[in-house]
Amino acid sequence: MRYALGIEYDGSGFCGWQRQNHSPSVQSCVEKALSNVADHAVTVICAGRTDTGVHAYCQVVHFDSNSQRSDRQWMLGNNSNLPDTVRVLWIKQVDESFHARFTAHSRSYQYRIINRWVRPAIGFSHYGWCRHELDSDNMHKASQALLGKHDFSAFRSAGCSSQHAIRDVSAIGVARSGDIVTIEITAN
C-alpha cells in the first residue's frame, strides 16, 4: 500500500532533506520514525528536497508499506518518534501510481526577509536579513516579469536530475508588512 503524508519541519538543525552519512537530515528522521511504526525499513520520496536550514510547512512525501495501521496510528506513532522540530500533519492511503515528486502540479515557496538596520536576535533562522532599505513595491513590479514559462538553466546545480529547466511561474508577489518583506512564488 502507498501512503502520502504532509510534513512540517524546522530545518535549522538539519543538513537539508536528503539523507546524509554524517549529518542529521529530515529524511533520515522521517524514515526512522516510519520504520518504527511499520516494523520494517521504510524509504520515503519527497516532492522537493530542501537545503540546509530550510523549513517546510507542508512537504508532501510518499512511502510504501504493507503494515496494517489506521491513519490515526500512523500519525500518532510517527509524531511520537519524531523530534519536536518535525511533525506529520496528515496521512492518507493513495493510489500506487501516486509519486510525491512527479505527481505534484506545482510547488510554492515563501522567502521572508527582515529589512531593518539591526540584525534580529529572535527568529533569525526563519528569516533572511537585509540592513539596506528594500523597495518592496518595485520588487513586486519587477517580479512580474518572471510570470509565465522561462528557462532557468542558469540556476541549476551541476547534478540536477530534472530533464529540463523550463518552468511555468503561475504566481509571484512581493509584499511588505512592517519590517518583514515576503516573497511568494508558485511554479510547476
In which residue ranges do the predicted regions lie?
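Structured-RNA-binding interfaces characteristic of tRNA pseudouridine synthases
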Residues: M1-N188
